[in-house]
């Protein structure tokens, strides 16, 4: 399990939101930063990514993904698959300890530093140390309330921050 962050993506109707907390943890017991931004817009704002894991590895994965998005004209699935294929062939890159959630108007993908691309069955996906807590909260809110995606994502992270010591309530949300 990767420590130090929680990222959640929530899709409902024609909207999708990605939210992340701001905590960066060093080792087992030191908080280095409270207000880190782990959510980014790519490809002229048409794609949102959120990353979890080792900071350097997550940034490397995000940068490589951005290059593939540019190369394949913003095609999210194609960029993810091409990145995964490159990743699996490179012995050094395969060892990256990072996960990335990437969304556009149509698709939600989980991309791992080990070269896997997964399209979730549900309209909600969570990663990072508090990902399962946030995902459970978001699923409950998604299917049992009239909240929009941004509010669901934010509330899910607030709940996760009360359970997971590696997640804080300094939340960034981006919506398409």
Swiss-Prot record:
Catalytic activity: ATP-dependent cleavage of peptide bonds with broad specificity
Localization (cell): Cytoplasm
Activity regulation annotation text: Allosterically activated by HslU binding.
PROSITE patterns noted in UniProt: PROTEASOME_BETA_2
Pfam families, per database record: Proteasome
Keywords: Allosteric enzyme, Cytoplasm, Hydrolase, Metal-binding, Protease, Sodium, Threonine protease
InterPro entries, per the entry: ATP-dep_Prtase_HsIV_su, Ntn_hydrolases_N, Proteasome_sua/b, Proteasome_suB-type
EC annotation from Swiss-Prot or TrEMBL: 3.4.25.2
Assigned GO CC terms: HslUV protease complex; proteasome core complex
GO molecular function: metal ion binding; threonine-type endopeptidase activity
Protein residues bound to Na(+): 161, 164, 167
Any one GO BP annotation for this protein: proteolysis involved in protein catabolic process
Gene3D superfamilies linked: Glutamine Phosphoribosylpyrophosphate, subunit 1, domain 1
Oligomer and partners: A double ring-shaped homohexamer of HslV is capped on each side by a ring-shaped HslU homohexamer. The assembly of the HslU/HslV complex is dependent on binding of ATP.
Stated family: Belongs to the peptidase T1B family. HslV subfamily.
Role played: Protease subunit of a proteasome-like degradation complex believed to be a general protein degrading machinery.
Name by which UniProt lists this protein: ATP-dependent protease subunit HslV
Gene source species: Thermoanaerobacter pseudethanolicus (strain ATCC 33223 / 39E)
């Amino acid at each position: 399990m990767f420590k130090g962050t929680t990222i959640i993506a929530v899709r409902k109707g024609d909207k999708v939101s990605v939210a992340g907390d701001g905590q960066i943890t060093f080792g087992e017991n030191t908080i280095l930063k409270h207000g880190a931004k782990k959510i980014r817009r790519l490809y002229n704002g048409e794609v949102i990514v959120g990353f979890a894991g080792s900071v350097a590895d997550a940034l490397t994965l995000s940068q490589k993904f951005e290059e593939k998005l540019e190369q394949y004209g913003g095609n999210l699935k194609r960029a993810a698959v091409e990145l995964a294929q490159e990743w699996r062939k490179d012995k050094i890159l395969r060892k990256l300890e990072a996960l990335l959630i990437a969304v556009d108007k149509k698709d939600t993908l989980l991309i791992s530093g080990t070269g896997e691309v997964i399209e979730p069955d549900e309209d909600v996906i969570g990663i990072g140390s508090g990902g399962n807590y946030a995902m459970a909260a978001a699923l409950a809110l998604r299917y049992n309330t009239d909240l929009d995606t941004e509010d669901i994502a934010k509330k899910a992270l607030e709940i996760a921050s009360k359970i997971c010591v590696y997640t804080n309530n300094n939340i960034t949300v981006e919506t398409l």
